[in-house]
Amino acid sequence: MKTTYVNATIVTMNEQNEVIENGYIIVENDKIIDVNSGEFASDFEVDEVIDMKGKWVLPGLVNTHTHVVMSLLRGIGDDMLLQPWLETRIWPLESQFTSQIAVASTELGLLEMVKSGTTSFSDMFNPIGVDQDAIMETVSRSGMRAAVSRTLFSFGTKEDEKKAIEEAEKYVKRYYNESGMLTTMVAPHSPYTCSTELLEECARIAVENQTMVHIHLSETEREVRDIEAQYGKRPVEYAASCGLFKRSTVIAHGVVLNDNERAFLAEHDVRVAHNPNSNLKLGSGIANVKAMLEAGIKVGIATDSVASNNNLDMFEEMRIATLLQKGIHQDATALPVETALTLATKGAAEVIGMKQTGSLEVGKCADFITIDPSNKPHLQPADEVLSHLVYAASGKDISDVIINGKRVVWNGECKTLDEERIIFEASRYKRGLQR
């Protein structure tokens, strides 16, 4: 099946960050086979021609760190620091989740993400009461591209920890697929919730199965103090001593890093998922993304969960990410528009090991989203496309979402998820949770 999308303004995010003002994209099944300017007069014979009527077409956004199973917990635990937020709000509520609640919560997060332009994401979920097979099946039905990872903790007995490791390794072997729509990573929660033995076992699983690692690291000053007091090392050095960086690793946050740590992370191909809104809301601080990029660290933007954000709008994350760097460095050139877009598209895709997506180029997967600026005053005059995408647009502006060549959202309507049922069930299950 060959489909041509014509009469579009195409934000390619190729090496030159080229914007084609009047162009077309040809998709064959799940791949882009042509991106060009001008009127469609290709040598390709196509099955369908779709007039985009001047819509902006850009790569689908890539969210490098989420917890979609927590989507029912939006608005619970506002105005709290990270540790009391986790210990008195989030974990007690998550412990009440059944597999049915987890699926309903996940569906809500998927619906929010895909309708606001996210096509790929990397997720960590708490396995208490949760069937990973059910979560993976739910994500698969949505049509989204994802790395969904079972989070490991050292809660309970040593026997509990051993069982958690066995379960995690089983799922890694079952679901790891570097080039597929769904994959997984090894995901120890953090240095403060995992024993040394557990972190070492996670490193072993990653090496033996050649998978990536996903972990919260250096998120707060308290974490750094506590880990240093307990182990005599800061979190980065401690994680390295456990062997975690033997495989490509994504660290969520990296708010509290020094110059030596940034250089070390770059040298060991450790990537950072930057969660600006979540870090601000939990009072964790502001990650120095400018310094990370200068050190050579791969960075991708992320939302974290709705419980700490409180939405999954990647446009909002792009905007706050660039504004924060300008503010903390008192440098208006810090994190310019093109860089912010890169960190939400092709750069983010590289962070989570999905190089097959993130830009609109021949050979890439057909993952793209559209915005119609014609009826949106906040996107007018419409000629400064890149600027408007970062500083003015929002997830509510999305018209269409194509993932792997399939129309997942079309004219604002999600084709893969039952929006009315999902919202009803989310409200019903939320009322049943005991605070």
From Swiss-Prot:
Cofactor: record remark: Binds 1 zinc ion per subunit.
Enzyme class: hydrolase
UniProt-listed InterPro entries: Amidohydro-rel, Deaminase_MtaD/DadD, Metal-dep_hydrolase_composite, Metal_Hydrolase, MTA/SAH_deaminase
EC number: 3.5.4.28, 3.5.4.31
Binding site for substrate: 94, 150, 189, 219, 304
Gene3D superfamilies: Metal-dependent hydrolases, Urease, subunit C, domain 1
Catalytic activity field: S-adenosyl-L-homocysteine + H2O + H(+) = S-inosyl-L-homocysteine + NH4(+); S-methyl-5'-thioadenosine + H2O + H(+) = S-methyl-5'-thioinosine + NH4(+)
Top-rank lineage group of the source organism: Bacteria
Gene Ontology MF, one: metal ion binding
Function: Catalyzes the deamination of 5-methylthioadenosine and S-adenosyl-L-homocysteine into 5-methylthioinosine and S-inosyl-L-homocysteine, respectively. Is also able to deaminate adenosine.
Name used for this protein in its record: 5-methylthioadenosine/S-adenosylhomocysteine deaminase
